[in-house]
Structure formats: structure tokens, C-alpha cells
Amino acid sequence: MASLQALRGTRDILPPETQVWQWIEQTAREILGRAAVQEVRTPIFEQTALFERGIGEATDVVGKEMYSFRDRGDRSLTLRPEGTAGTVRAYIEHGLASQGGVQRLWYTGPMFRYERPQAGRQRQFHQLGLELLGTADARADAEAIALATQILQALGLKNLRLDLNSVGDASDRAAYRQALVDYLTPYAADLDPDSRDRLERNPLRILDSKDERTQAIVAEAPSLHDYLSERSRQLFEQVQQLLTHLGIDYRLEPKLVRGLDYYTHTAFEIISSDLGAQATVCGGGRYDGLVSQLGGPETPAVGWAMGLERLVLLLQQGQAVPPATLDFYLVSRGAIAEGQALILAQKLRSAGFGVELDLSGSAFGKQFKRADRSGAIACLVLGDAEAEQGQVNLKWLQSGEQQTLDQSELLQDSDHWRSRLQAARTVSPVEVAPL
């Protein structure tokens, strides 16, 4: 019988790598929470029509990449390829627009696209996204970008660049679309196969082709900025001014278009120079027509999504690692000590300390080796002699300094020991399996 393994394009995320994922999610949760952004959780599968109407039937995502199937009720369902459409569906279904003001939502979870697996790109992948629904104010665009930047900076990521563009409104794009088709049609035979296919279906996507020959042709194409209405220009200028006031550097990229049809006006990507071809770690923009397109009221909105696999890949390359979270590794040996160690571990956890209890029952030497590998700040050592005296030996794993103290000292003066642990805490590397 063939062995059962994870499917191509999927992967198991195991300790200690899960610590990195938790760090990313917790960092985002804290930063977004301080901005009054609340988490929303939507189903992993939805009606296929949601994505066909929302993302656009002419897009590669809908045309080539969705995991769709018919259930026993003969309904066409799809594993979500992105998070915005489902969030907007929930916004409409639950009448969030009627609550007034701006709905500030974020989400995280797995998404699914049938793509060729490679570093930083899987068929099951994870995104963390932000949606600000109910405002056309340019400040929302700037705030969304600022929050994304703040999260990435808090993770210690470097070598990042913000690319910014405006794709205008529907009228702007319709006029530009025709001008682009008129320009590209004489060169159709020289375009790469994907771009030839897009010439009629989705010509704006040709602008971000990676084919060198196509890029040379596109370099002389008309500029979308020449087709922006006065309102579109004003909004884009306001966004640029606000980013400048916030001290956020950006690069204007007039050929930047996003791969989903719902984008209007502001479009942006945050790119890492350390990721090669899969360089975009965050992308988003404004989507003022999506809510009404899916059956809701006219609702301006802006948002973004981060690819978590790509963030983990950057952390794997050593740019940054999460701080150690384990305070104590507790080793014990002897019938009395082992029973008391379990009680001590629970009391310390109740007091707010992170404690791993060695349950191997092996010799102290082997337990000490595991303590050294655990990432803990200190090792607590409990033998029968210490247990009978109500004491415990404490060893600081970085310095090797040791001391004996009453167990009650750890529990009664927890603030003191928490300060000592914080002072001794160092950022230590976390091993991450290759993606």
C-alpha cells in the first residue's frame, strides 16, 4: 500500500515553526486591535458564484486556479481562493452597513488555488487580511497601508519597498482598456502565450507580465495615468500626501495592477528584495464597487492581504525571529520529586509563567540536554532532597549561574522573577522547515 502523505502544494506546519506563525498572528492581532480592527471568521468554502461575481470570471484565479466541486445537493461550491469576497458577503448578509460608520475587520486563515508549487507559493496557503468598509476617505487608504507597514516593521522585516498606483474607476479603466488593446493588437504574435490569452479577456494583466519580450512591448504602452479622471487624480494625490506625512516611503509604479477585477483607484504592493520571483508579501487597494456588485448597498472600501508563507520564508532567512516565550524547563528525578514537580509546574503556570515539564523520567543528564534545546530562559531542578525541603534549584541557561531557593519564593514574589526572566531573555533563533 502506498504511504499516505500530504498532497503536493500542501505542507504540515510543525513545532518549532508553529511558534513563528503564532508570533506573526499575535503581532498583527495586537497592532490591529490597537486600531479598533476586529476579527471576522468566514467559511472556508462558499458558493462558486460569489467568486465568479466578486473576483471576475476573466481573471486567472477564477478561470484556472479555483478548487470547485459539486456537493450532494448539486450545488457548485469553491474553496476560497482569497478572503475579501467572503468578508464582503458576510458584511452584506449580516447587515453590517446598517450599523453606520466604518466597519474595521481583519481575518486570517487558509486559502486555496491550483498553482505550480514553489518557495513561498502553495496550493493551500495562508493570508492575513484587513478590510475597512464604508469610507471613501483617502485617509482610509493611508491608514490601511500604515497598519500593514507597522506589522511588517514589528516583525523586524527589512529590505521592503512600497509600490503604489491608481487604477482609476470603472470609466477610467474602460477607456484605458480600449487604448491598451489598440496598442497591443499589432504585437499580438510577439506576446507570450498568457498575454495573448489575456489580450481579449483581461488586457490590464498584461502590464505585469514577467516575460522579457512582453515587458519590452509594454514599456512603450499608453499610461493608465493619462486616462484618470480628475476625481481619480485628486484621490491618488491625497493618498500620496498622507503617506508622505506619515513618513512612509513609496515608489510610483504606473504599471502595477492587481490580479482581481474588483480593485478601483488605489492599488499597492509591499515587496521584499529578499524573495526572488515571489517578492510580494502584501498587496491590496480600494474596491469601491464590490459590495454593490455582490448585492449590497453602494459601499466604498479598502483592504489588503499578506501572504503568511512568504513572511515565514523571510523569517527563515534569518531577518528576524520571535522572542523566546518559555520561562522555565522543569526537570525532576525521584518518586517524591516527580509528583511535586507536576504540582509546581501547574502553580507556576497559574501565576503566568511559561513552564515545560520534562515527563521522560530519564536521567538528569539527558533532561539537562533537552533543557538546553528547549529555548527556556532558566532550568528548574527538583530531586527528592529538594522536594522534601520545599526547595528547587534554578539554573540560568545562558550564563550558567545557579542558585537554590524555596519554591514559595517563585510563587510569592512572581513579579520579581518575571523581571529577572525578562532581563535574561534574549532573542534566539527558531528553526523553520523549508517551505
UniProtKB/Swiss-Prot annotation:
Location in the cell: Cytoplasm
Gene responsible for this protein: hisS
NCBIfam families in alphabetical order: hisS
Organism: Synechococcus elongatus (strain ATCC 33912 / PCC 7942 / FACHB-805)
GO molecular function, one term: ATP binding
EC number(s) given by UniProt: 6.1.1.21
Record's GO cellular component terms: cytoplasm
CDD domains assigned: HisRS-like_core (cd00773), HisRS_anticodon (cd00859)
InterPro entries given in the database record: aa-tRNA-synth_II, aa-tRNA-synth_II/BPL/LPL, Anticodon-bd, Anticodon-bd_dom_sf, His-tRNA-ligase, HisRS-like_core, HisRS/HisZ, HisRS_anticodon
Subunit structure as annotated in this protein's UniProt entry: Homodimer.
Protein name: Histidine--tRNA ligase
Keywords for the protein's UniProt record, in alphabetical order: Aminoacyl-tRNA synthetase, ATP-binding, Cytoplasm, Ligase, Nucleotide-binding, Protein biosynthesis
Pfam family, one: tRNA-synt_His
Superkingdom in the source lineage: Bacteria
SUPFAM superfamilies, A to Z: Class II aaRS ABD-related, Class II aaRS and biotin synthetases
Family under the similarity heading: Belongs to the class-II aminoacyl-tRNA synthetase family.
Reaction(s) this enzyme catalyzes, per UniProt: tRNA(His) + L-histidine + ATP = L-histidyl-tRNA(His) + AMP + diphosphate + H(+)
